[in-house]
Design a protein with these regions (language model features):
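Composition- and surface-driven signal marking solvent-exposed, interaction-prone regions
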Residues: 1-2, 12-18, 28-31, 39-42, ...
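Primarily recognizes the serine-hydrolase "nucleophile elbow" in alpha/beta-hydrolase
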Residues: 74-146, 150-155
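Hydrophobic beta-strand segments of well-ordered beta-sheets in folded domains
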Residues: 1, 24, 88-90, 112-115, ...
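Active-site loop/turn elements of alpha/beta-hydrolase fold enzymes
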Residues: 30-32, 116-119, 166
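Serine-hydrolase catalytic core
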Residues: 103-109, 123, 145-205
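Short, contiguous acidic/charged loop-to-helix segments that flank catalytic cores in large enzymes
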Residues: 10, 58-66, 90, 139-144, ...
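Cap/lid segment of the alpha/beta-hydrolase catalytic domain
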Residues: 3-81, 85, 123-133
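Acidic, Ser/Thr-rich peripheral helices and adjacent loops at domain boundaries
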Residues: 41-52, 130-143, 180-195
Length: 205
């Protein structure tokens, strides 16, 4: 299991350890997250992360894209270092990390499975709200002209993807998540977030 945190691997590792069973648990702070974060942790719409995101845009790249690249390199390293011939990898992304994990799972040539905790169901939903508290660097510029998160989730498929307690544009639990998934066309196993914190079998919504 490889945890891709929302804001800090060290602070969020306990959320997944009990669900790991006999799996080895790894965690990574991608660029600008956790140990590599520039400035204090916490919401700051125009802080260091926004500045880094803006610099990448001026260079014709994206912070999200660079984080996906980072994660794919970590996945590659873990596979190279694995001693068991039957080694399989499960990505677990939370919040901002859930978006990165979803893209990385899609691009992974070994078809890693992915569990998303507090992921957005749709970036279109962000545009429909008066206020969105997700960081600007969590979305690709011009993405909605081509696809949205339900398309990404559909490409992964329910065999590889599970979503635990999706978040709204304000980064709070989606009310009536099952109905919202149906409305947005999200096809994935939908489960309660406490299933991860508590371990054991997840209760379906």
């Amino acid at each position: 299991m490889l945890l891709v945190p929302d804001s800090s691997a060290s602070a969020e590792l306990h959320l997944v350890e009990r669900a790991a069973a006999d799996e080895a648990v790894y965690a990574v702070d991608l660029r600008g997250i956790g140990a590599s974060r520039a400035g204090p942790a916490g919401p700051d719409g125009y802080g260091a992360e926004y500045q880094i995101h803006a610099h990448y845009l001026m260079l014709g790249e994206s912070l999200l894209g660079r984080r996906v690249f980072d994660l794919l390199r970590v996945v590659q390293l873990l596979r190279q270092e694995a001693t068991a011939p039957s080694f399989t990898l499960r990505l677990v992304g939370r919040g901002n990390g859930a978006i990165v994990a979803a893209f990385a799972a899609l691009l992974d040539d070994k078809n890693a499975s992915v569990d998303l905790i507090h992921a957005p169901l749709s970036c279109t939903a962000w545009a429909e709200e008066a206020l969105c508290t997700w960081p600007a660097g969590s979305v690709l510029r011009g993405m909605l002209q081509q696809f949205d998160m339900p398309d990404l989730y559909g490409a992964l498929g329910p065999q590889r993807l599970r979503i635990f307690e999706p978040w709204t544009a304000q980064m709070s639990p989606v009310p009536d998540a099952a109905d919202e998934c149906a409305r947005r066309g999200v096809q994935a196993g939908l489960l309660q977030a406490r299933a991860y914190a508590g371990g054991g079998a997840a209760a379906k919504l």
